C-alpha cells in the first residue's frame, strides 16, 4: 500500500475520533457543538488559503488564470450543489422539546451525512494526489484534514447521539462521512495512480480549496451562530486557525511540511 493512500486513510479515520468524543460522557452542549463547527471552519480557511491554493498556483505548468479559475469553479460548484441538494443541519437533531420519530431521525441523519460526505470525497482525492506529487506537502494537508475531521465527526455524532441516545448509531453516521474521504483516496489510487500530471493535481487542489472556503463561510460559521446565538463563532474560527497555523509552523521548522 502506497504512503499517499495510507495518509488519506488515516486522515479519513480521524472522523472516528470526533465521533467517540461526541458520544463519551454527557451529550454535547450546543456551545461545544458550535465551537467545534467554528474550529473546523478556521482550519479549513487557513489550510485552503495559505497552503492548498498557493501550492496549486506554484505547481509546474499551472497558470494563474487556470489556478484561480479552478478555485472559483470550486466555490461556484459548492454553491450550486448547496442550492440543489436538500438541507439537514445538526440543530435539526438537537431539538429537546420534541421527541422525533425514528424515520425522521434517520432521514435527517442521511441528509446530514450526505452533505459532509460530498465535501469529504474530493478531500480524499486531493490528499492522495497532493501526497503523490509532494509527500511533505501531502503530509501537511493530511494532518490538516485529519484535524478538521475530528470536530467534523463530533458535529455529526454529537447531535445524532443527542437525538437518538444511541452511541452506535452516532458513530455509524459519523464513520460513513469519514469513509467517503477514504473512498475518494482509494478511487484516485485505483483510477489515476501515477498518471496524474502536476497540473491536474494542482487543479484538484484549487477546486477543493474553493469548496472548503465556501463550506466554511456559507455553512459552518452561520450554522455555529444559529446553534448557539449567545456566543460568537469567531472564537472557534480563531482557535482553529491558530492550531492549524501552529502545526504548520512546527512541520516547517522540523523540515516535514
UniProtKB/Swiss-Prot annotation:
UniProt: Zn(2+) binding residues? 123, 148, 152
Compartments, record wording: Cell inner membrane
Query: Which catalytic reaction applies to this protein?
Result: Zn(2+)(in) = Zn(2+)(out)
UniProt entry keywords in alphabetical sequence: Cell inner membrane, Cell membrane, Ion transport, Iron, Membrane, Metal-binding, Transmembrane, Transmembrane helix, Transport, Zinc, Zinc transport
Keyword Transmembrane assigned:
yes
Q: Where does Fe(2+) bind?
A: 120, 123, 149, 152, 181
Q: How does it sit in the membrane?
A: Multi-pass membrane protein
Query: What cellular component terms from Gene Ontology apply here?
Result: plasma membrane
GO molecular function terms listed in the Swiss-Prot or TrEMBL record: metal ion binding; zinc ion transmembrane transporter activity
Q: What is its main location?
A: membrane
Task: Kindly list the residue ranges recorded as spanning the membrane.
Answer: 5-25, 32-52, 61-81, 137-157, 171-191, 195-215, 236-256
The function of this protein is:
Mediates zinc uptake. May also transport other divalent cations.
The text of the family note is: Belongs to the ZIP transporter (TC 2.A.5) family. ZupT subfamily.
Can you name this protein?
Zinc transporter ZupT
* Annotated source species: Escherichia coli O7:K1 (strain IAI39 / ExPEC)
Amino acid at each position: 500500500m502506497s504512503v499517499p493512500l495510507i495518509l488519506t486513510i488515516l486522515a479519513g479515520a480521524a472522523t472516528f475520533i470526533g465521533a467517540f468524543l461526541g458520544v463519551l460522557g454527557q451529550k454535547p452542549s450546543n456551545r461545544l457543538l458550535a465551537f467545534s463547527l467554528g474550529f473546523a471552519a478556521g482550519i479549513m480557511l487557513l489550510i485552503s488559503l495559505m497552503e492548498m491554493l498557493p501550492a496549486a498556483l506554484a505547481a509546474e505548468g499551472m497558470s494563474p488564470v487556470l489556478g484561480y479559475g479552478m478555485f472559483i469553479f470550486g466555490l461556484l460548484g459548492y454553491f450550486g450543489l448547496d442550492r440543489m441538494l436538500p438541507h439537514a443541519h445538526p440543530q435539526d437533531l438537537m431539538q429537546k422539546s420534541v421527541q422525533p420519530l425514528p424515520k425522521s431521525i434517520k432521514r435527517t441523519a442521511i441528509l446530514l451525512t450526505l452533505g459532509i460526505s460530498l465535501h469529504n470525497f474530493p478531500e480524499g482525492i486531493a490528499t492522495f494526489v497532493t501526497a503523490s506529487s509532494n509527500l511533505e506537502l501531502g503530509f501537511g494537508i493530511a494532518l490538516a484534514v485529519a484535524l478538521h475531521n475530528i470536530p467534523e465527526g463530533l458535529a455529526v455524532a454529537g447531535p445524532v447521539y443527542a437525538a437518538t441516545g444511541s452511541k452506535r448509531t452516532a458513530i455509524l453516521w459519523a464513520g460513513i462521512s469519514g469513509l467517503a474521504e477514504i473512498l475518494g483516496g482509494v478511487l484516485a489510487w485505483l483510477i489515476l495512480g501515477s498518471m496524474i500530471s502536476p497540473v491536474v493535481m494542482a487543479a484538484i487542489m484549487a477546486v477543493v480549496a474553493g469548496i472548503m472556503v465556501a463550506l466554511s463561510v456559507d455553512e459552518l460559521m452561520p450554522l455555529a451562530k444559529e446553534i448557539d446565538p449567545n456566543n460568537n463563532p469567531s472564537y472557534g474560527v480563531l482557535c482553529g486557525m491558530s492550531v492549524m497555523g501552529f502545526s504548520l509552523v512546527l512541520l516547517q521548522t522540523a523540515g516535514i511540511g
